[in-house]
Swiss-Prot record:
Gene Ontology MF, one: structural constituent of ribosome
Role summary: One of the primary rRNA binding proteins, it binds directly to 16S rRNA where it nucleates assembly of the head domain of the 30S subunit. Is located at the subunit interface close to the decoding center, probably blocks exit of the E-site tRNA.
Protein name (Swiss-Prot/TrEMBL): Small ribosomal subunit protein uS7
Domain of life: Bacteria
Family designation: Belongs to the universal ribosomal protein uS7 family.
HAMAP family in the cross-refs: Ribosomal_uS7_B
Organism (species): Xylella fastidiosa (strain 9a5c)
CDD domains: uS7_Bacteria
Sequence intervals crossing the membrane: none
A biological process from GO: translation
Tagged with keyword Kinase: no
C-alpha cells in the first residue's frame, strides 16, 4: 500500500462532437490498446444508429447508464477463517464505471454484425430495462440481497 496518499482524480476532457464528459469516458472505456480513433468511430457510429431510431441519443445513453448502474455490490471479507460476501453500497463514480463496463462487455457478446450496431442495440435494450447489462445488475443485486445477513461486517 502506498505511503504517499491517494493520487488525485484526473479530469476527462469532454468529447469534441457532443461536448459531454460521459461520452468521453465511454469512449475511453471502449478503447483497446490505445486505439482511440477506433473507439470514437464505434461510439459515434452507435450514437448515429440510435439517432436514426430515437430523437436524442445522449439522453438515451444517460437513461441506459442510470438503468444499468448498481446500487449495491458484494465484496469479499475474511473473518476468522471464513470468507463472507459482504454487501456494500457503490459510490457514484464506481457506479458509473461499472455501468459502462457492463454495457460494453454485454454489447461485445451480442450477435449483430458490427460493434457500433452491437453497442447501439445494447444501449436501446438497457434504456428499456432489458438486455445483458441489466441481467448483470440484477444478478449483483440478488447476490447482495442473499448476503444481507453479513451487512454488519462492512468496514
Amino acid at each position: 500500500m502506498s505511503r504517499k496518499g491517494s493520487t488525485p482524480q484526473r479530469n476527462v476532457l469532454p468529447d469534441p462532437k457532443y461536448g459531454s464528459e460521459t461520452i468521453a469516458r465511454f469512449i475511453n472505456m471502449v478503447m483497446k490498446s490505445g486505439k482511440k480513433s477506433v473507439a470514437e468511430k464505434i461510439v459515434y457510429g452507435a450514437m448515429n444508429v440510435i439517432g436514426e431510431k430515437n430523437s436524442n441519443a445522449i439522453e438515451l445513453l444517460q437513461k441506459a447508464l442510470d438503468n444499468v448502474s448498481p446500487a449495491v455490490e458484494v465484496k469479499s471479507r475474511r473473518v476468522g477463517g471464513a470468507t463472507y460476501q459482504v454487501p456494500v453500497e457503490v459510490r457514484a463514480s464506481r457506479r458509473m464505471a461499472l455501468a459502462m463496463r457492463w454495457l460494453i462487455d454485454s454489447s461485445r457478446k451480442r450477435g449483430e454484425n458490427s460493434m457500433p450496431h452491437k453497442l447501439a442495440a445494447e444501449l436501446l435494450d438497457a434504456s428499456e430495462s432489458r438486455g445483458g447489462a441489466i441481467k448483470k445488475r440484477e444478478e449483483t443485486h440478488r447476490m447482495a440481497e442473499a448476503n444481507k445477513a453479513f451487512a454488519h461486517y462492512r468496514w
